[in-house]
Amino acid sequence: MSLVIRNLQRVIPIRRAPLRSKIEIVRRILGVQKFDLGIICVDNKNIQHINRIYRDRNVPTDVLSFPFHEHLKAGEFPQPDFPDDYNLGDIFLGVEYIFHQCKENEDYNDVLTVTATHGLCHLLGFTHGTEAEWQQMFQKEKAVLDELGRRTGTRLQPLTRGLFGGS
């Protein structure tokens, strides 16, 4: 099914073709390529607004995920009853926030891929509110990014590394 990437900001340049290519591979690795997915790139002002409305946090952030199929357990696949239900949901990337959070020698486009992968894991029910949930999500992200690396030659680390003292 389709992957739609929308760039609704003009602060940070987005290279959509490489991002699309890597996210398509991530979708295949996760086994969810038959589901629609929306990725929306926004600036700090808009990600902060969305974060305030939906999470009651009045600060910009890197990623917000809005699953079409709520209440999935970690790693569970949606079981659509109708063709229109083949939708994972939407991921909002705070690209301005992500750009400014990049460390020296980090490739911004790689960090976008990692952040989108993190958002995809959230759409599949993964969370990181507790150490056990974090460990499960970290392992999933790591496995996906390692496989992406085998297929593309990139070496990427999960977004959640270090959240609970992990490496």
UniProtKB/Swiss-Prot annotation:
User: Where would you say this protein principally sits, based on its record?
Assistant: nucleus
The entry's localization annotation reads:
Nucleus
Q: What is its EC number?
A: 3.1.-.-
Q: Which co-factors does it depend on?
A: Zn(2+)
Keywords of this protein's UniProt record, alphabetized? Endonuclease, Hydrolase, Metal-binding, Nuclease, Nucleus, Zinc
Superkingdom of the source?
Answer: Eukaryota
Cofactor binding notes: Binds 1 zinc ion.
Binding-site residues, Zn(2+): 118, 122, 128
Naming one, the record's GO cellular component terms include: mitochondrion
Identify a single GO molecular function assigned to this protein: metalloendopeptidase activity
Q: Name one GO biological process term.
A: rRNA processing
Further comment: A protein of the expected size has been detected by antibody binding and Western blot in at least one of the analyzed tissues or cells.
Q: Which family does it belong to?
A: Belongs to the endoribonuclease YbeY family.
PANTHER family, from UniProt? ENDORIBONUCLEASE YBEY, CHLOROPLASTIC
Instruction: Name the job this protein performs.
Output: Single strand-specific metallo-endoribonuclease involved in rRNA maturation.
Q: What is this protein called?
A: Endoribonuclease YbeY
Give the source species: Homo sapiens (Human)
Phylogenetic lineage: Eukaryota, Metazoa, Chordata, Craniata, Vertebrata
Q: Which gene encodes it?
A: YBEY
